[in-house]
């Protein structure tokens, strides 16, 4: 199924389709991985004005929370493409996973994405999948651009003197944006 999506994606030469179509096709690709089966439940939540979803499995502790930031080069990627991965992360860690659709380029420039993620992390400290309530453990994680964001968010929280996550798990972080690297 992923192979068909790749062929479809690269056969499109109509630039009028734009970023919206590019993002949608990218999400189709990531959600089609048959090796990552979705499990548990996911439900939408308003994260202080940012669209989000809580992802949980039967062993998820609602007071142990991970803010997971999707990859996508700071320009693509949404919650939809990461639900399966988040459900597996919830199952393996026993945590509740919060996914958010943070601001993307080129529509919004730096530091909008970091500010959205900081706002979501602060919100998550006091709000869980069961509503208001403090968390006992908090984590920030992400892959690629999301991994870079997880580092940037944590450093920005530190600079602000805000509460820090108990741990950060950056997967293949795109942390250096210099074109030389």
Locations of regions flagged by a protein language model:
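A glycine/proline-hinged amphipathic helix-loop "lid/cap" segment
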Residues: 1-57
